A protein has these predicted regions:
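Alpha-helical transition-metal enzyme core signature, strongest for iron centers
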Residues: 21-29, 48-62, 80-87, 110-124
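Short, recurring structural edge motifs at helix starts
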Residues: 14-20, 31-33, 77
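Short gly/ser-rich anion-binding loops that grip negatively charged ligand groups
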Residues: 69, 73-84
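A mid-sequence interfacial segment
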Residues: 92-131
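Solvent-exposed, well-ordered amphipathic alpha-helical segments
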Residues: 4-16, 97, 126, 131-132
Length: 136
């Protein structure tokens, strides 16, 4: 993300928390909609989906305020860096902790997701490389 006028402030932290909260809510409501639909509650599912769409727009509002949306090359790089963090640091650490605490099956799931995140990073970096060839 590009630096914003909020850099280093509590307001920046609040914007980041708002983005994370709205993003999490969107995902939860999407999952809730799927469950309601499977149980035959079409109207409830539709309400969850409508609310999820609202949460998506709220998240976008805060993400844009944080200059989180760049041009396509910047977005590919940001995505690649995020995926790199997830597979090299986040999920690796989660797996080690789960193993240490005796949750070996969960540790294995963390490692499997890490491998997928690595693939995501590779795809984004390949696309970024291809994009750079177009702009030469």
């Amino acid at each position: 993300m590009k630096e914003t006028k909020y850099a280093g402030t509590q307001t920046e932290k609040n914007l980041m928390a708002a983005f994370a909260g709205e993003s999490e809510a969107r995902n939860k409501y999407t999952y809730f909609a799927s469950k309601a639909k499977k149980e035959g509650y079409e109207q409830i599912a539709a309400l969850f989906l409508k609310t999820a769409e609202n949460e998506k727009e709220h998240a976008k509002l805060w993400f844009k305020e944080l200059n989180g949306i760049g041009d396509t090359a910047e977005n590919l790089l940001s995505a690649a860096e995020g995926e790199n963090y997830e597979w090299t640091d986040m999920y690796d650490g989660f797996a080690k902790t789960a193993d240490e605490e005796g949750f070996h099956e969960l540790a294995q799931r963390f490692r499997l997701v890490a491998a997928i995140e690595k693939h995501h990073e590779e795809r984004y970096r390949a696309l970024l490389h291809n994009l750079s060839l177009i702009h030469i």
